[in-house]
UniProtKB/Swiss-Prot annotation:
Stretch list, region G4 motif: 327-330
Organism: Schizosaccharomyces pombe (strain 972 / ATCC 24843)
Name assigned to this protein: Transmembrane GTPase fzo1
Gene name, Swiss-Prot/TrEMBL: fzo1
Catalytic activity: GTP + H2O = GDP + phosphate + H(+)
Region (G1 motif): 161-168
Residue ranges of the region described as Disordered: 1-25
GO terms, molecular function: GTP binding; GTPase activity; GTPase motor activity
Amino acid sequence: MEKSARQLSVAEQNGESGRLNNGYTSNNIQQYKDETNRHQFEYNQNRNQLLRSIHIIQNLLNELDNYVDRSDCLFHSVWRTDKEKSKFSGNYYPFSPSKMNVITIDLSLRSSSTADEKLISQLGEEAHESLLKVHIEKANKHLFSLFSRVEDTSSKILITGDLNAGKSTLCNALVHKDILPEDQQPCTEVFCEVHDAELNDGKDCVHAIPHGLTYSHTDSSTYKVFPIEDLKRLVYETENWSMLIVYVNDGRPAHESLLHNGITDIALIDAPGLNTDSMKTTSVFACQEEIDVVVFVVNAENHFTLSATDFLRNASTEKSHIFIIVNKFDNIRDKERCKRLILEQIHTLSPGTFADAKDLVHFVSCRVARDPNNREDALYSSFFQMENSLRSFILENRSKSKLAPVRRYLSGLVGDILNICEYNIKLIDFDINHLQQRLTDLSPKFRKVKHEQQFTYQKNESLVEATVQSISQHTHSELEDAIDSLGSFASVKYSGFFFAYQYAISVRDAMQQYLEEKLLESEDYARKRTEEAVLCIQKDVKDNFDSAVLPVFHANQMFIKKHRLQLQKHFRFELGLLDFIDLDLTERLGTWSASLSTILLVLGKTTPSFTTLGAFTGNLGYPIFKYFQNNSLQHLLVPVLGLASICVFGYVIYDIPRALPLKVAEKIKKSLRETDFCHNASIWIGTESRKVLNIPLNDLRRMFHQQWDKQRETISVAENDLRICQKARKFFGEIESRTREAKKKIMMVQLEGCDINY
């Protein structure tokens, strides 16, 4: 920046004629106004751009803060010192986070920083997310302070220094009024903030702020008003007031006045002298965001004391440039040596200040400058050079004093946000590639395995159906044949008429036993076929599941006696007399007719002629006829009936071995067929076999479904993880893009002489 408007003094003007107050000519004033307007336009542009950038970055931080609160949040910490392992693949990521500038972890145990870093690396995901939220909260608070600072058009100048260094004298000289007490002993014990009286309707007065209250000019309850003359008394009343707000009119034109400059509102803050009690408070006050410029007053006779050294070292962490005024320089005889020693100390304490020492370090005497009779003294001109440099540093270089720290912080913060986004994008892309490849491998494999297992299950299901059908058909056929053959059953020996009833019981029991044996044979057949099918199913189970534990099949435990009990009820009947008699002679007569025809055919070849037979009949028949002729039919009826009864009874007794089994068999057949015993027994045995076969079949199906469910769950988890990664990738990608745009806008803020060190 040009020096013409920045360092105007009496010694630098050409001639005495045409000079105005303090050596300013009309040309100099117009040049000052033009250059001031240009700087004000540039300042407003940069200021507005930084305000917009702060708002954008706050939105980005709030979105990050909301994101880590989500249940599907995927955040990779940037504070790890070792490589992170992927929770999706189990492999270590081939990336490491970049160094952070602003969002850093401040470890208090400096001696064991390595151990602390390892401890931070071992924290879980939730802890790192909480750390990010804490840093976001801190950054938002700082951004809010920076926003207030940039938005505020006023500038605050803190004037501090060692005890009795001349701070109050400097303030009086800068406002060209004797308002603060001056003494060789420490005077100011309360912070005094000096403003232009225009901010108080042009009235010179003091607003004393009691302890515990926050000052507001529009709220009269937050302060007490005193006349300006009472200020020299109020500065000693530390027990009553926390701060004194002073409104004063220095009566100078805008191009000369520091407070009434026509560009921005400036406040001079006169701080108590540094000592053991006040140094810490003043250092903290100097580091606050609302302090734009720190003016440090040094007693030329004492140089930098220990308290001054500590203060400058602390304040330099926030303010890279400090305006230093070496007062009482008129008391020094070897001025060059004094300058050299003080500049060497400044070089060590504040390198930024030393680099601009021509503009920021001034050797003056406030006592000499306040006496107009000392115009010819070089120290008189030096004071006005210092005043112009201070005006230039505050007004023309407000970008350096007010905007540069904001731009520097914003640049570092967007760099950290970009580091977070870029690091997370790299790791998320790594996981997305792994999950996509995993799904590419899993889906076809799952479909193929499922198709093969479905075929295996259907094959075994068909085997079960075929086995059950075969068992049912075999049982039905065997029982039907057995029932049909009951009539020809002759395994029981007949012991005579007197044992006919026992014979009937034995025949009935034998038929029951015979049918039960057929049932047992059918059960044995069902066991055999069922065992074969079970072993076949278990073989498929073992082929598909090597680690499956198969139960031992016990075929002898199949079936219960229920169907045999059903059979027994068909044999629980009483034997009657008719069960021993077969009155149906049709079949019997048919047999006799065939036998008689055969006999006559044989006898016909040997029978005598009819003549011979007739002679025989005539000789024998006549006596018989003669007998019946002499005896009536009434006398013959009883003998004939008796003979017939004897014949019938004899026939019945003779026919019991044949008739009884037939009658019992018919009764059993009728009972069995009425209840459809064969069908029910075949269904029962088939059902029991199906129950047994369904056990390994259901086990096979269950194992298949469990495997399918597990594979589907694996695929579903991978798909869900992929969706989470893709959402996170989209989120960080959008944040990264918007952050880069914000960074471009921040970099467009060009501040003269201010470089970004991040």
